[in-house]
């Protein structure tokens, strides 16, 4: 028997997912904080989190210069300069706005979620989560595969590793998984230990390359002749602009930059309920710093590799293909230094998935469990890490650890997320003046127009990428379909949970009347009819929210008395049957009378799943039976009468 507390909000009913695990393995899997809640004890200064973001962003230096050479040849520096301009003038401002408006680690998807209500909004979010999963999962698998490829092409390691790309890739992914099973703090430490030496070694190679260029003026003369063959300055800029989308992988890292915001420490006085201004400022510093470091390295690497790497070397299957800086490290410093550089390139590529793993761990648990579209255990870190490793292992096996085969999907995922972010920011700024910001209305509109231009640039980049690499859309679509399928299956399976977030009794009179009803004192009746029964009746009226796609609901209850009977008004429900079942469990009535419509079960099932209506009487019975099976008690269950409306 349950007695009502004095507080207006009643304690939630127990559920099998809330029960503590009974085994040691279960306790280990659920250890640590929940991923759908902020953990203020696991934050670090933005300078430390920078390396976690940078482990993905900076790792593209392992293959980006080689891709630029293969795609643009002598025009690689021009195309790279345009890429840097798009980064600093487009991506950085966009994600600075995203950081201000979506500071809980949900990225630009949270901004777009509010554009559409109901199932349309849910489908939009799920589709974007599919592209985010494409971006982040392929980041992990492609980077690990490229690390394996670098190891196999190293002259010292090749005799021991040749021909085992897949096994080596899986081993590297397993190592990343072990780090994240240990915790986020360990991941931050490993990221810094990997990234800083890699950047120092890269700067050493590029500085030596620039020195070599100054010693050989003929290299500069040959480069100028190659540029002159493409026309004047206008022609070079136009050609570079057309080639720049092929370098789109150099834009990766920004979505993960905002998705790891929960790890960034803010000011001690940041409000818990409002915008954490200190964390937002720190994240903006992180984004700008990462972009500036990467921009300098991209420009230097494009100039050095274009002038010093011969075309035969960076052609497909050439010794510099996909590893132009590593090729120069061996050529300029010898095998010992070259192998050291290879080792750190392997390390940063192997750990490049760290920011992607962090992003997914902060992204998926904040959406899909809330939508009822993922099992409840996905809110815990260790089960999610193991799930993501399984997905990455399957992707690696499907692609046979082929770096080139995964490149199209990677670029597609990155560009779709950047396009959606730019679109969301432009739309938000366009709407703000209409919301009453009179003094800043014109400035807001001007910024909105600027971000619409940025949106157009990202749209052009995405379309060009899809035309050149259409297989990327196919692979990304498979991820989207996978997310949608898993979401639908989980929503169907979890539909018969109680689905109540909180229950608040609105006024003191209602609380007093509620207390009188609890504990085998009334007969619960969701519909009014003629009954011949002893004892008072409690009539339950349920009002549904407008957005029936929501999974959990905060209920508001008022109670009034009519003669010896009671009327319970429940507002804010997402499903009639689940709400009646929840109220029944709280009141613990003697008898529960339920109606049956006798209409098509198929139609009623769809009405229940999509709109919270349907054959409510039958569904109340099923929900209660499932709840009773999962939470056995010594209490006597109420008698349930299912009565057809036609009888």
Model-derived regions: residue spans:
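Helix-loop-helix junctions that connect adjacent transmembrane segments
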Residues: 196, 200-252, 467
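Cytosolic C-terminal regulatory domains/tails of membrane transporters and channels
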Residues: 1-38, 496-647
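Extracellular/periplasmic helix-exit of transmembrane alpha-helices
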Residues: 207-217, 266-276, 288-324
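Transmembrane-helix boundary/entry motifs in multi-pass membrane transporters
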Residues: 38-39, 48, 96-135, 157-165, ...
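Membrane-interface "cap" regions at the ends of multi-pass membrane proteins
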Residues: 2-63, 112-114, 118-126, 237, ...
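Extracellular loop-to-transmembrane helix junctions
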Residues: 68-113, 120-125, 141-173, 197, ...
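Loop-to-transmembrane helix boundary motifs in multi-pass membrane proteins
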Residues: 117-122, 162-171, 265-297, 365-400, ...
């Amino acid at each position: 028997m349950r007695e009502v507390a004095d507080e207006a909000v009643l304690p939630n009913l127990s559920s099998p997912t809330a029960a503590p695990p009974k085994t040691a393995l279960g306790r280990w899997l659920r250890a640590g904080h929940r991923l759908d809640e902020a953990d203020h004890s696991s934050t670090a200064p933005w300078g430390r989190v920078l390396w976690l973001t940078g482990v993905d962003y900076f790792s593209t230096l392992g293959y980006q210069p080689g891709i630029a050479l293969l795609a643009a040849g002598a025009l690689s520096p021009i195309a790279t300069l345009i890429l840097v301009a798009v980064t600093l003038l487009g991506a950085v401002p966009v994600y600075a706005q995203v950081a201000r408006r979506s500071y809980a680690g949900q990225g630009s998807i949270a901004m777009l979620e509010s554009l559409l209500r109901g199932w349309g909004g849910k489908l939009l979010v799920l589709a974007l989560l599919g592209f985010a999963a494409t971006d982040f999962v392929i980041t992990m698998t492609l980077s690990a595969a490229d690390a394996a490829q670098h190891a196999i092409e190293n002259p010292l390691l090749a005799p021991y590793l040749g021909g085992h790309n897949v096994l080596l890739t899986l081993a590297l992914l397993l190592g990343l998984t072990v780090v994240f099973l240990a915790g986020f703090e360990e991941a931050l430490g490993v990221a810094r230990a990997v990234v800083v030496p890699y950047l120092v070694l890269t700067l050493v190679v590029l500085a030596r390359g620039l020195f070599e260029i100054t010693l050989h003026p003929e290299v500069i003369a040959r480069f100028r002749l190659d540029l002159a063959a493409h026309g004047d300055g206008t022609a070079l800029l136009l050609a570079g602009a057309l080639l720049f989308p092929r370098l789109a992988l150099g834009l990766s890292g920004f979505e993960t930059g905002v998705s790891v915001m929960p790890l960034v420490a803010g000011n001690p006085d940041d409000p818990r309920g409002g915008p954490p201004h200190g964390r937002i400022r720190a994240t903006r510093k992180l984004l700008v710093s990462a972009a500036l470091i990467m921009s300098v390295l991209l420009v230097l690497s494009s100039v050095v590799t274009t002038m010093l790497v011969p075309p035969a070397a960076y052609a497909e299957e050439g010794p510099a293909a996909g590893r132009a800086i590593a090729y120069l490290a061996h050529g300029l410093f010898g095998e010992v230094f070259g192998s050291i550089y290879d080792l750190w390139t392997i390390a940063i590529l192997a750990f490049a998935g760290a920011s992607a793993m962090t992003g997914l761990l902060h992204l998926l648990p904040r959406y899909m469990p809330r939508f009822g579209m993922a099992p409840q255990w996905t809110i815990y870190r260790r089960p999610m890490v193991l799930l993501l490793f399984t997905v990455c292992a399957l992707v690696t096996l499907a692609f046979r650890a082929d770096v080139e085969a995964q490149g199209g999907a990677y670029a597609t995922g990155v560009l779709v997320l950047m396009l959606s972010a730019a679109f969301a920011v432009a739309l938000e700024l366009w709407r703000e003046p209409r919301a009453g910001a009179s003094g800043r209305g014109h400035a807001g509109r001007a910024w909105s127009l600027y971000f619409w231009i940025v949106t157009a640039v990202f749209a052009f980049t995405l379309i060009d990428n899809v035309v050149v690499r259409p297989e990327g859309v196919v692979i990304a679509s498979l991820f989207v379909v996978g997310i949608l399928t898993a979401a639908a299956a989980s929503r169907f399976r979890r539909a018969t949970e109680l689905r109540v977030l909180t229950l608040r009794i609105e006024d003191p009179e209602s609380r007093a009347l509620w207390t009188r009803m609890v504990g085998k004192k009334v007969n619960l009746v969701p519909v009014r009819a003629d009954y011949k029964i002893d004892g008072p009746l409690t009539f339950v009226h349920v009002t549904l929210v407008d957005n029936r796609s929501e999974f959990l609901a905060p209920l508001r209850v008022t109670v009034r008395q009519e003669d010896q009977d009671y009327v319970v008004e429940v507002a804010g429900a997402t499903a009639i049957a689940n709400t009646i079942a929840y109220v029944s469990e709280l009141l613990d009535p003697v008898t529960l009378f339920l109606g049956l419509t006798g209409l098509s079960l198929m139609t009623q099932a769809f009405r229940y799943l999509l709109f919270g209506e349907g054959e409510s009487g039958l569904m109340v019975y099923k929900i209660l039976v499932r709840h009773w099976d999962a939470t056995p008690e010594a209490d006597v269950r109420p008698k349930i009468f299912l009565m057809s409306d036609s009888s």
